[in-house]
């Protein structure tokens, strides 16, 4: 919830590395930062969006749940002339950090950052041997805790729903047999086992472990629950005319964002299950296209941009109707949240 999922470019003179996040131009076009505006960046990461927003003259309140990102960003704070505040916080709590008069914009870049993936000791990548951790902060259960202790039925739900893994049952049952002999400790332990269960075929575009690792990361960090809570928080924190811009990389993330904007713009209709939908004033109006994806040029330059989707809305003056997870029609969210708790 990939905080900044872009690549990195080095300055020609050998100066500092500048992080270029995904869909930067598109994010700025939707967000419209300018002098006098206060923008909240809910996923600071390596500071790519925050830096560009500062360059446009706006003030930035930046959040990140990863203490490593907070520490690394202190030099940006010092160089900002007081226009950047960097706060260790989950973005679900963004309304707590908004000024009383409201925010002019909120940007969220959802998921795991390239910085986190690149650090083997964080345990996010199956391509690097490291501890099976995947936590964005030191709190909570690790991926190893889940793999070694969860019921097989729960592993199947996690891999199947969050990872959309078709072989969830086979993988979970094989994990159960293996952990009875020795616990899983490293990323390679788990990746190697998955490869034996679902060996890679020549036509496969992704590694066999991709979906399971993605599912564990999303579960360990409650990424979908955090995203849903952040959308409702942004609705409360934005002033009329303020803009909410969200970049997501996973189909379930995009489904949540799309559903939120449809519901809040009054475009969500009934269904055979919920045929009667009470009309209410729209709290968001659309910005540009319903969904923006990376250009072919950006996708070829940065493979991580291929799955990126941007959605945005402008806050109206209508009062927030409050948080309601039922609008997403994802009962699995509450079920998995109870499991994580």
From Swiss-Prot:
Keywords: Cytoplasm, Methyltransferase, rRNA processing, S-adenosyl-L-methionine, Transferase
Keyword Ligase part of the UniProt annotation: no
Alphabetical GO biological process terms: rRNA base methylation
Keyword Ion transport (UniProt): no
Disulfide bridge positions per record: none
Gene Ontology CC annotation, any one: cytoplasm
Function noted in UniProt: Specifically methylates the N4 position of cytidine in position 1402 (C1402) of 16S rRNA.
Top EC group: transferase
One matching Pfam family: Methyltransf_5
Cellular compartment(s): Cytoplasm
SUPFAM superfamilies noted in UniProt: Putative methyltransferase TM0872, insert domain, S-adenosyl-L-methionine-dependent methyltransferases
Protein name from the UniProt record: Ribosomal RNA small subunit methyltransferase H
Swiss-Prot/TrEMBL catalytic activity: cytidine(1402) in 16S rRNA + S-adenosyl-L-methionine = N(4)-methylcytidine(1402) in 16S rRNA + S-adenosyl-L-homocysteine + H(+)
GO molecular function terms noted in the UniProt entry: rRNA (cytosine-N4-)-methyltransferase activity
UniProt family annotation: Belongs to the methyltransferase superfamily. RsmH family.
Organism encoding this protein: Sinorhizobium medicae (strain WSM419)
Annotated EC: 2.1.1.199
HAMAP family xrefs: 16SrRNA_methyltr_H
Positions bound to S-adenosyl-L-methionine: 47-49, 64, 91, 109, 116
């Amino acid at each position: 919830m990939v905080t900044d999922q872009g690549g990195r470019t080095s300055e020609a003179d050998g100066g500092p590395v500048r992080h270029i996040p995904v869909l930067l131009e598109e994010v700025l076009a939707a967000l419209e930062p300018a002098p006098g505006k206060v923008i909240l960046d809910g996923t600071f990461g390596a500071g790519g969006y925050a830096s560009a927003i500062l360059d446009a003259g706006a003030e930035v309140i930046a959040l990140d749940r990863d203490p490593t990102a907070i520490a690394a960003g202190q030099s940006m704070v010092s160089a900002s002339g007081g226009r950047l505040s960097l706060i260790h916080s989950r973005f679900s709590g963004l309304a707590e950090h908004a000024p009383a008069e409201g925010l002019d914009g909120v940007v969220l870049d959802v998921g795991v950052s390239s910085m986190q993936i690149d650090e083997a000791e964080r345990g996010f990548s199956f391509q690097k041997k490291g501890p099976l951790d995947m936590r964005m902060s030191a709190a909570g259960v690790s991926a190893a805790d889940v793999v070694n202790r969860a019921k097989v039925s729960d592993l199947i739900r996690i891999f199947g729903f969050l990872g959309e893994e078709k072989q969830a049952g086979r993988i979970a049952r094989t994990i159960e047999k293996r952990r009875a002999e020795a616990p899983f400790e490293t990323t390679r332990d788990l990746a190697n086992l998955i490869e034996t269960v679902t060996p890679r075929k020549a036509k496969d575009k992704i590694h066999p472990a991709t979906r399971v690792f993605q599912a564990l990361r999303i579960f360990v960090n409650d990424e979908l629950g955090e995203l849903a809570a952040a959308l409702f928080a942004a609705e409360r924190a934005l002033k009329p005319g303020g803009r909410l811009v969200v970049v997501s990389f996973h189909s379930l993330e995009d489904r949540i964002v799309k559903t939120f904007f449809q519901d809040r713009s009054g475009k969500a209709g009934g269904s055979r299950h919920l045929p009667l939908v009470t009309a209410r004033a729209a709290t968001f109006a659309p910005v540009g296209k319903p969904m923006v994806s990376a250009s072919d040029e950006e996708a070829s330059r940065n493979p991580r941009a291929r799955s990126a989707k941007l959605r945005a809305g402008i806050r109206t003056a209508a009062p927030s109707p409050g948080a309601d997870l039922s609008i997403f029609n994802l009962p699995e969210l509450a079920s998995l949240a109870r499991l994580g708790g």
